[in-house]
Curated annotation (Swiss-Prot):
UniProt site (Involved in the inhibition of stress granules formation and contributes therefore to virulence): V95
Motif (PPXY motif): 35-38
Top-level taxon: Viruses
Biased amino acid composition, Basic residues: 1-10
GO MF term set: structural constituent of virion
Alphabetized Gene3D superfamilies for the sequence: Rhabdovirus matrix protein M2
GO BP term, example: viral budding via host ESCRT complex
Protein name: Matrix protein
Membrane topology listed for this record: Peripheral membrane protein
Gene: M
Organism of this sequence: Rabies virus (strain China/DRV)
Length: 202
């Protein structure tokens, strides 16, 4: 009888050790990070180089075996080298990617889709940033693989200037978005006139 108990116990131990099938992006390699916070539009002291943009962002992660944010962060660290869009708006694209990937993904077949739709305020330092009235339609595919894993990122960002009341994009410096911006080397500086606002340097 003891022998049978040992066999049953051993089988139970084996069952608990088996990895469960991947049904959601694994997040065991990430500390939980709070979502970004948005500050409603207010009166800015400085009006220079300020633009209100209606944003649509989508990042589709294609991976047959699931993925971790460690891999996504690894891919995004080389973003400056692989970005193929309008370089006057690369800072805006980085902001949108970070905010998009901070949301909750929706499964779509073997893919995971992150989406963002929002009106955001952007301020650029000096004479940087897009031209007046300039819009952006950017799509790009980035793939990464080694002997064990394949991950593809399909990025789409559209931005058009609009007059809908917007929000400052983020003040929560401990959010995942800020972690991803750091990985992409987003260049910003704090606004001297508006303490809640960051000026884009790219």
């Amino acid at each position: 009888m003891n022998f049978l108990r040992k066999i049953v116990k051993k089988r139970k131990d084996e069952d608990t050790q088996k990895p469960s099938p991947v049904s959601a992006p694994p997040d065991d390699d990430d500390l939980w990070l709070p979502p970004p916070e948005y500050v409603p539009l207010k009166e800015f002291t400085s009006k220079k180089n300020m633009r209100n943009f209606c944003i649509n962002g989508e990042v589709k992660v294609c991976s047959p075996n699931g993925y971790s944010f460690r891999i996504l962060r690894h891919i995004l660290r080389s973003f400056d080298e692989i970005y193929s869009g309008n370089h006057r708006m690369v800072g805006l694209v980085k902001v949108v990617i970070g905010l998009t990937l901070s949301g909750a993904p929706v499964p779509e077949g073997m893919n995971w889709v992150y989406k963002l739709r929002r009106t955001l305020i952007f301020q650029w330092a000096d004479s940087r940033g897009p031209l007046e009235g300039e819009e952006l339609e950017h799509s790009q595919e980035i793939t990464w693989d080694d002997d064990t894993e394949f991950v593809g990122l399909q990025i789409r960002v559209s931005a058009r200037q609009c007059h809908i009341q917007g929000r400052i994009w983020c003040i929560n410096t401990s959010s995942r978005a800020c972690q991803l911006w750091s990985d992409m080397s987003l260049k910003t500086q704090m606004s001297e006139e508006d303490k809640d606002s960051s000026l884009l340097l790219e």
